[in-house]
């Protein structure tokens, strides 16, 4: 019953550990997240996610809704970690040196959750992701790193468009 996922549930350390375990698991993370969304679990556990489900992005860079774009970002990060792809050898090497991959995945999930709220979506998402990471019981250092990654994610977008203008796989 989705109604059981309330503030008490979301603040329970057992469920926080289970969510982090999902992020670190060997299984197809984007498929798991999509299934959670389909069942309403993701929106119940991360209420901010509910606000972007089906939300169109009206710009030159995005062709997917915010939620679908988010799943593609997570999928691409996961594939970059698991498989060395031609042209992305350095990225594959670097992502595999990240000691806490869940930090990157959480930043990926939250990077656009501030859209549609008015104001700078990066700043809104940074605050939201910081609160979420703290709720999960993550250290202050990890929570602040997630928040910083969300706040600065447009730098990587600018870099990507400058260096890989034909790569529209997540937009």
Pin down the residues of each PLM region:
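A glycine-rich phosphate-binding loop feature that marks nucleotide/adenosyl-phosphate handling sites
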Residues: 2, 49-55, 145-154
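Acidic/His-rich, divalent-metal-binding segments that scaffold phosphate/diphosphate chemistry
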Residues: 4-121
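Conserved, well-folded catalytic cores of nucleic-acid-processing
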Residues: 39, 80, 135, 153-156
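Short acidic, glycine/serine/threonine-rich loops at helix termini
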Residues: 48, 158-159
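Extended, hydrophobic alpha-helical segments in both membrane/secreted and soluble proteins
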Residues: 103-136, 142-150, 154
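Conserved small/polar residues in nucleotide/adenosyl-binding loops
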Residues: 160-166
């Amino acid at each position: 019953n989705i109604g059981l996922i309330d503030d008490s549930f979301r603040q329970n350390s057992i469920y926080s550990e289970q969510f982090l375990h999902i992020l670190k698991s060997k299984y197809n993370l984007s498929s798991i997240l999509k299934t959670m969304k389909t069942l309403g679990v993701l929106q119940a556990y991360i209420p901010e996610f509910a606000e972007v489900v089906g939300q169109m992005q009206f710009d030159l860079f995005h062709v997917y809704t915010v939620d679908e774009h988010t799943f593609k970002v997570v999928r691409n990060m996961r594939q970059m970690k698991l498989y060395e792809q031609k042209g992305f050898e350095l990225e594959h090497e670097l992502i595999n040196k990240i000691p806490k991959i869940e930090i990157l995945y959480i930043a990926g999930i939250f990077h656009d959750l501030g859209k549609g709220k008015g104001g700078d979506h990066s700043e809104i998402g940074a605050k939201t992701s910081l609160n979420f990471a703290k709720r999960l019981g993550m250290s202050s250092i990890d929570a602040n790193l997630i928040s910083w990654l969300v706040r600065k994610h447009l730098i990587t977008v600018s870099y990507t468009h400058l260096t890989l203008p034909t790569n529209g796989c997540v937009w």
